[in-house]
């Protein structure tokens, strides 16, 4: 992978924030039945996670959610160009957080038909090859 771009850095920052929020849910869940304050802490952690999740994953200043991002991949607008670069960066990094696998696979499929630049196509092909190898290794190890 080439040097981390601004988009890569934002995805990594979001990944860390999502993991912290998700971890907070788990740590407060274990104590939620202890008393009312613990229950409220757990509720607050859940609410905070759900309120921020979409904005962190999709960088809400650019996309309103998964469907918006997927829809923009085929557009020939400035937003479409940015969406394709965001999607390529996302699958290059393969961030690990709640529901990332669904989005990863969906972007992998949708980018196959998107109008990519030569650089993006080259990066996509490398990712696709690595994914095929990963799947093959999983099948052989089962």
Annotate each language-model stretch with its function.
Residues 1-142:
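Extended repeat-based scaffolds of very large eukaryotic assembly and lipid-transport proteins
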């Amino acid at each position: 992978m080439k040097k981390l771009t601004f988009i890569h850095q934002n995805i990594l920052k979001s990944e860390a924030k999502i993991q912290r929020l998700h971890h907070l849910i788990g740590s407060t869940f274990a104590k939620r039945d202890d008393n009312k304050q613990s229950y409220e802490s757990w509720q607050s952690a859940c609410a905070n996670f759900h309120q921020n999740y979409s904005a962190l994953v999709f960088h809400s200043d650019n996309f309103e959610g998964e469907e918006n991002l997927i829809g923009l991949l085929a557009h020939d607008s400035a937003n479409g160009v940015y969406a394709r670069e965001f999607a390529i960066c996302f699958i290059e990094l393969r961030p690990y957080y709640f529901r990332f696998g669904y989005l990863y696979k969906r972007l992998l499929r949708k980018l196959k038909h998107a109008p990519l630049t030569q650089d993006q196509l080259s990066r996509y092909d490398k990712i696709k090859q690595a994914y095929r190898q990963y799947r093959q290794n999983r099948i052989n190890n089962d």
